[in-house]
Amino acid sequence: MEHLYDGVTFPEPENLLDWGPETNGRSFKGQPLEELVRRWKIASKDPDKWWCRYPGLPFSTEGMQRTTARRAAYQKLIRDYMRCGATVDDNIGKLLKTLDEMGIADNTIVVYVSDQGYFLGEHGFFDKRMFYEESARMPFVIRYPKKIPAGERLKDLILNVDFAPTLAEFAGVKMENVQGTSFVNNLEGKTPPDWRKEIYYRYWTNHAIRPAHFAIRSDRYKLIFYYAQNLDMTDTGNFEFTPSWDFYDLQNDPHENHNAYNDPKYAPVIKQMKKQLLNLRKEVGDTDEKYPEMQELLEKYYNKDMR
């Protein structure tokens, strides 16, 4: 796969040249492709840096204009990523072929899943962590011919805590005292009418360019609160960051290019989502009651809006 896609120019995401809060009004800087270029530079000089091991080095954007450099970094990132994906695809093919040869394909559940999504140049980012769609949406493909119709795509809100009870139900095992909910009915085309309408998200690690936050997402809207407190995380450094909110209308702004938190037309929606977010935090037991600094911060930046 080393030379796969050599000479290919991949399409760019529409917001590749998003340069930060000044571009879309978001609350944080994020982890831009320029940071990845810095790591490539370190690895080019010292290949034994374990956290900087990348293919196709040396690579440099020195001497390039800023826009040209970012585009060059994106092309390298996506080319490496696609090569990796092709290798994974080959091996999945071998697995499925073996199941067919063994005669057990129709009675075997095959799941392809990741622990999160990944930025591939969207917003000028690489990596994950932040609650934009590219990072928050997890790849999940499941194959079970005798139970699940092929070629279908669900729009239901599914969480990774739902995986275990789902597989257990397929196996005839009843699970008790788990946070997740089986989505076997959803996969069979019979989504329960009371299926969840919102999901809760939290990112604990606190950093100057990717502050700690929690959030709520419905089928249309997303609300994020960046509280930027270290709490139990002791190695994240000290920095100045004013707690703030981001809000996105995923129907009118699917690529999350404009933070609409201060748009007055969304004020009723935002107020309602803050209430729903509070309820979700209570539901999962994530209320920060043991952190006095968080209670003070929430009173100042959150609770006053609920009155």
Task: Enumerate the predicted regions with their spans.
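Short amphipathic alpha-helical coiled-coil/interface segments
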Residues: M273-L277
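Signal for well-folded cores of large energy- and translation-related assemblies
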Residues: Y54, T287-K290
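Mature extracytoplasmic/periplasmic domains
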Residues: D263-Y266, E289-Q295
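C-terminal cap/loop subdomain of S1 sulfatases and analogous C-terminal strand-loop tails that border
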Residues: Q116-E122, V161-A164, E169-D246, L250, ...
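Active-site-proximal cap/lid insertion segments
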Residues: M1-I158, E169-V178, D232-W245, E256, ...
